[in-house]
UniProtKB/Swiss-Prot annotation:
The keyword Nucleotide-binding does not apply. Gene3D superfamilies: Severin, Villin headpiece domain. Pfam families: Gelsolin, VHP. Binds actin and actin filament bundles in a Ca(2+)/calmodulin-insensitive manner, but is unable to sever, cap, and nucleate actin filament formation in vitro. Does not protect individual filaments from severing by VLN3 (AC O81645). This is Villin-1. InterPro entries: ADF-H/Gelsolin-like_dom_sf, Gelsolin-like_dom, Villin/Gelsolin, Villin_headpiece, Villin_headpiece_dom_sf. It is found in: Cytoplasm, Cytoskeleton. The modification Phosphoserine is found at S780. GO terms for molecular function: actin filament binding. SUPFAM superfamilies: Actin depolymerizing proteins (SSF55753), VHP, Villin headpiece domain (SSF47050). The lineage of its organism: Eukaryota, Viridiplantae, Streptophyta, Embryophyta, Tracheophyta. It comes from the Eukaryota.
């Protein structure tokens, strides 16, 4: 919320209330709001202020302020833009990160807001005419950058051309792209995006496009026409060696504190610690290529403006004012780059009340007459892994890889490593998943052998398998529905593990059915139940879970105070699955008997606070390269599918899991090599978000992206299936050529709602005992023989079951192979109030328009008889744009998780 005072500019009234961009131009010594239609058009004679708002689901909003200074902007406007940036920060509660942007040296984060590029316009901004004295003329543009393109107008002369860059010649009837012979494929592809932008915005899509290859002239009419603009062809001279900048070693960061008069005082130490930063002072951290100004919470607005002016003056005296990035940080909002210069910067973890909030919303819907099972969890994957069809599990024991029988597939041991392969069909597209499951007590040699054997299996599927490296206890939620019911026992069957146990004399720690055992029961439904054996001590208990304590022919069930009703249902079913024939003794937390405590070795303290799951706020995409065993990464801001260039390797950091995407034309040729990159990324923890080496790492190849990867993009399958390099694909797309694909494209997962995704699966049969398994190809003779032997075990019947949408009561009986549907009482409200489908025609909803205040979840006068999961659809087009900052068509083109974030921020979900 804005926090305005009489000293804050009225232009900031109501800012920061919705996600997106807001832009102002300094005009006649005051701020003028720029209309959305002019976003991305910056004039070199002006200074601008740009606010980017991101309303997060759990934490407070994220604000980034950029003040952009044109190369011809006067000093008065530049200083005013800097001061107004601080005023805007104050209006937003002093919780922003501010960046100074100089024309031609903009940060990649700033450029990412205006894809594919910004092309500064000469002259000054005029609110009446837009551009003072603008006339169309032939221009020559130089493009630099392989992932973020920087466009600069250069003199329309042959001498402006060189062999290293890509140039665009924009004429009245044709746009030429000239590619220097030393330019990369990615640079040419990015420049082609600029060509498309120019064609659409300056020529209304009505002009020809031609590409000119440096050094190729004969027989090319387009090349002849291009050179005619320069008075005829002539060789381009090579750049002299003197123009090549030598790489200098980056000096250590130097910290200064800034007094109230603006004087800089060096701290005189190269070893920096957070305790050196005092709340009532401002500091400047000079990192040579970038400078940070840190402002304590107890400093005044005047002190902050003085410190910024002093830092800018420092850069001017150093001759670095146009080449050095300046970032302004308020105490408590330090970014990862700034923190990396300090020793052991303490991590602060914000507590999350997400689950409690969802429970309150569910209760509210229930009061309104809706069945809460109709409300999908936006973070869950569609239930494409709701049965054990085509599941195979191998146990790794040194050089031996043993295929497990069907009954043993659901029994894993903490001292072993396993390969879990699952093949399923989604929208007529076959998907392959191969997990490397690492037991928490497994031997390092077995872990290495597991990865090697997994790579062999992946090789036999021609790279189609998605490889995932997971540790016990850190499995992704989509791992468990493959098993439906899974038990993890302590101990192991590996020869190496048994030798280690014998050496350490820990034989008694293995599972023994004749001795007492404690199992933690986990799962949200009968589709993903787990019983995990834990240490037989009271400290293993946790109030958030339920437990089964087996001892001989008897059993206790312990129900934590913070466990849910679904936990209790899963507990009852796991008792049956564990084959506990006796009548269990139910104990609620706080009512334990002496016998119970004695079996656990006595009463002791255990965790009693609610465990919260980690939410994906905003994924981060990085391009990566590895040279001399050193991993180098660079973040791609505001990423889209087109950023995944086929020549590169990318890392998608989702905090709770990491994806390594391999372009088909990259120099990474094996998934084992890609997995190594992912593990190195975990070790680096670039964003200092608490990544551990146990974080799941997926390896995905281009053209075989699974739905749980593409959900983070506005995904178009046809783009991923095109042939050629990045430049050839862009050119073919621009010229409208029909391109061949690598394989038949799958359905667009992103555009499908979870309702429809699940509904599509209802027509599929659920195998009651894991039958209908496919043959798993393996590269070694041993693995091939295992696949052949498996065919002899697959002779069972399957019972088709029509599963209700979002129902949690499907139970597969492992003994008789019959799927049973537990009856549950449902409200008749659904019959009285038919729900509108997620893909129904928007016009039918718009005909029932309601005001925003009526549609809010917390409305005092709520509207009834609507689809509660699509409240935004009942807004008029005008009010929708006012609230969301975009048209409905743009909104529904966003990934589902982004839609839900916006709806939650506006109290519409």
């Amino acid at each position: 919320m804005s926090r305005l005072s009489k000293d804050i500019d009225s232009a900031f009234q109501g800012v920061g209330t919705k996600s997106g961009l807001e832009i102002w131009c300094v005009y006649n010594k005051q701020l003028i709001s720029i209309p959305k239609s002019s976003f991305g058009k910056f004039h070199s004679g002006n200074a601008y202020l740009v606010l980017r708002t991101f309303l997060r689901k759990i934490e407070s909003p994220q604000y980034d302020i950029h003040y952009w200074l044109g190369i011809d902007a006067n000093e008065v406007d530049s200083i005013l833009a800097s001061d107004k940036a601080l005023d805007l920060d104050a209006a937003l509660g002093c919780c922003t990160v501010q960046y100074r942007e100089v024309q031609g040296q903009e940060t990649e984060k700033f450029l990412s807001y205006f894809k594919p590029c910004i092309i500064p316009v000469e002259g000054k901004y005029s609110p009446k005419t837009g551009i003072a004295g603008e006339t169309y003329q032939v221009t020559l543009l130089r493009c630099k950058g392989d992932h973020v393109v920087r466009v600069k107008e250069v003199p329309f002369l042959r001498s402006s051309l060189n062999h290293d860059d890509v140039f665009i010649l924009d004429t009245a009837s044709k746009v030429f792209l000239f590619a220097g012979c030393n330019s990369s494929t990615q640079e040419k592809a990015k420049a082609m995006e600029v060509v498309e932008y120019i064609k659409d915005n300056k020529h209304d899509g009505r002009c020809e496009v031609a590409t000119i290859e440096d050094g190729k002239f004969s027989g090319d009419s387009d090349a002849g026409e291009f050179w005619s603009f320069f008075g005829g062809y002539a060789p381009i001279p090579k750049l002299s060696s003197s123009t090549t900048q030598e790489q200098t070693q980056t000096p250590c960061a130097e910290l200064f504190w800034i007094d109230t008069k603006g004087n800089l005082h060096p701290t005189g130490t190269s070893s920096l610690d957070k305790d050196m930063l005092e709340k009532n002072k401002c500091y400047m951290l000079d990192c040579h290529s970038e400078v940070f100004v840190w402002m304590g919470r107890n400093t005044s607005l005047t002190e902050r403006k003085t410190s910024i002016s002093s830092s800018e003056e420092f850069l001017r005296k150093e001759g670095r004012s146009t080449t050095t990035s300046l970032v302004l940080l308020t105490e408590g909002l330090e970014n990862a780059r700034f923190r990396s210069f300090f020793n052991k910067w303490p991590q602060t973890v914000e507590s999350s009340l997400y689950n409690e909030g969802r429970e309150k919303v569910a209760a509210l819907f229930k009061q309104k007459g809706y069945d809460v099972e109709e409300l999908p969890d936006e973070e869950d994957d569609p239930l494409y892994t709701n049965c054990r069809d085509n599941l195979k599990v191998w146990r790794v024991d040194g050089d031996d890889v043993s295929l497990l029988s069907i009954p043993d597939q659901t029994k894993l041991f903490t001292g072993d490593c396993y390969l879990v392969q699952y093949k399923y069909t989604y929208k007529e597209r076959t998907e392959h998943l191969l997990y490397v499951w690492i037991g928490c007590e497994s031997i390092q040699q077995d872990r290495a052998d597991a990865i090697t054997n997994a790579s062999a299996i992946v090789g036999t599927t021609k790279g189609e398998s998605v490889l995932c490296h997971i540790y016990q206890g850190n499995e992704p939620s989509r791992f468990f529905p493959m098993f439906q019911s899974l038990v993890v026992f302590k101990g192991g069957l590996s020869r190496r593990y048994k030798v280690l146990l014998a050496e350490k004399e820990k034989i008694g720690e293995e599972y023994n059915e004749n001795k007492a055992s404690l199992f933690r029961v986990v799962g949200t439904s009968p589709r993903n139940m787990q019983a995990i054996q834990v240490n037989l001590v009271a400290t293993s208990l946790n109030s958030s879970y339920s437990y089964i304590l087996q001892y001989g022919a008897s059993a206790f069930t312990w129900i934590g105070k913070l466990s849910s009703d679904s936990d209790h249902e899963v507990l009852d079913r796991m008792l049956y699955f564990l084959d506990t024939s006796c009548q269990p003794i139910y104990i609620r937390e706080g009512n334990e008997t002496d016998t119970f405590w004695n079996l656990l070795g006595g009463k002791s303290e255990y965790p009693k606070e609610k465990e919260m799951r980690k939410q994906i706020e905003e994924p981060h995409l990085f391009t990566c390269s590895c040279s001399s065993d050193v991993l180098k990464v660079k973040e791609i801001y505001n990423f889209v599918q087109d950023d995944l260039t086929t020549e590169d390797v990318f890392l998608l950091d989702c905090q709770s899991e990491v994806y390594v995407w391999i372009g088909s034309n990259s120099n990474i040729k094996s998934k084992e090599e890609a997995l190594t990159l992912g593990l190195k990324f975990l070790e680096m923890d670039i964003l200092e978000e608490g990544l551990t080496m146990r974080t799941p790492v997926y390896v995905v190849t281009e053209g075989h992206e699974p739905p749980f990867f593409t959900r983070f993009f506005e995904w178009v399958p046809e783009k991923a299936n095109m042939h050629g390099n990045s430049f050839e694909r862009k050119l073919a797309s621009l010229k409208g050529k029909k391109t061949s694909t690598k394989r038949s494209s799958g359905s667009q997962y992103r555009s499908q709602s979870k309702d429809n995704a699940s509904r599509d699966l209802q027509s599929r049969s659920v195998s009651s005992n894991g039958s209908e398994r496919g043959v798993s190809p393996c590269s070694s003779e041993k693995l091939l023989s295992l696949s052949s032997a498996e065919d002899m075990t697959n002779s069972s019947n399957s019972t088709p079951v029509v599963k209700k949408l979002f129902s949690e009561s499907l139970l597969v009986d492992p003994n008789d192979g019959v799927a049973r549907q537990e009856s549950s009482s449902k409200s008749d409200i659904s019959k009285q109030k038919p729900r509108v489908g997620i893909n129904s025609d928007l016009s039918s909803l718009e005909s029932l328009a309601y005001s925003y205040e009526q549609l809010r979840v917390d409305s005092q006068k709520p509207v009834t008889d609507i689809d509660a999961t699509r409240r935004e659809a009942y807004l008029t087009e005008k009010e929708f744009e006012e609230r969301f900052g975009m048209a409905k068509s743009e909104f529904y083109a966003l990934p589902k998780w982004k839609q839900n974030k916006l709806k939650i921020s506006l109290h519409l979900f």
